[in-house]
Amino acid sequence: MTERKIRVAALQEKAMPRSSVQEKLGRTLELIETASKDGCQIIVAGELCTSDYDRFYGTKDVSLFPEAEPIPGPSTEAVGKLTKKYKNYVIFPMFEKAAPGIYYNAAATIGPDGTVVGNYRKTHVAGVQVLEKLYFRAGQDFKVWETAFEPRARFGTIICHDRRYPETSRILAMLGAEMMFCPTAAPGYAGGVHWGVVNIARAVDTGMFCIYSNRVGPEGNKKYFGESMIVNPHGEVIATGGDRENAVIAADCDLALVDEARIAVPTLRDIRNDFYMKYYSKPSYDALI
């Protein structure tokens, strides 16, 4: 049987507070090139990688909106030049302007032909501590893509806060994903068990590779801890970024482990969606409203 292995990378970008979109983009393009030269076939950058995420906390900052771009647009075109050169995929998270007055926390997937082949919009927009709901609409869809090259790997994307909802990763798995990419911008309070334990749990829940990127370093009054990681379907961390700045965290993923994990613990086979729905249809927990 032909081996099904694919090399992936998470970019751990150093925060660049109050620098321009172009300056941040330049940093990310350099890291994409480094990862591509290392043979990485799917690369994920950090959440809102061309924006200062600390500015989404507190009072609404209307000066952020001019930074938003359409998808496709100038930034995705710049990334596309590299994916076309190296014949790989890049998941590029950004502040998307979908239409006048309509914005999303998005992650464009740019393919080997240099074009945008997909776009995921964050479905669980944070509304506690960081006030994303003042800026972004919630996405309404999950999708899985298949690589145009062998081993025809199937992958999907969620964004940061989405990972706290097991349904997000499980839906991707049920749609056929073997890998989940999750760009984040997680500062100190999102560390500890809220980071490693949750990230590992999503891999174990679904029996797939989970790749998490995070920024690192100070930005305004926030400090991002890095610790980007790649977790295999058995819940083993196979690569981590620690607190390194502008680092490429890469690993070779043997996709045979996906079936191995799902056969050993067949949660996807035994899931009872019809049973759960009678509870999901009831009012949500509202003690904090």
Task: State what each model feature region is.
Residues 1-5, 26, 288-289:
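Basic/polar N-terminal segments that are highly enriched at the extreme N-terminus
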Residues 92-94, 106-109, 143, 228-230, ...:
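Short beta-strand scaffold segments in enzyme catalytic cores
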Residues 68-69, 81, 98-179, 187-201, ...:
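Active-site catalytic loop in hydrolytic enzyme cores
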Residues 256-289:
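A short C-terminal boundary segment appended to hydrolase-like catalytic domains
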Residues 51, 55, 108, 120-126, ...:
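Short beta->alpha transition motifs characteristic of CBS
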Residues 2-14:
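Short beta-strand segments enriched in small/hydrophobic residues
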Residues 18-112, 119, 186-206:
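Cys-nucleophile CN-hydrolase/nitrilase-fold catalytic domain and related Cys-dependent amidase chemistry
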Residues 71-91, 154, 160-249:
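CN hydrolase (nitrilase-like) catalytic-core segments centered on the catalytic cysteine
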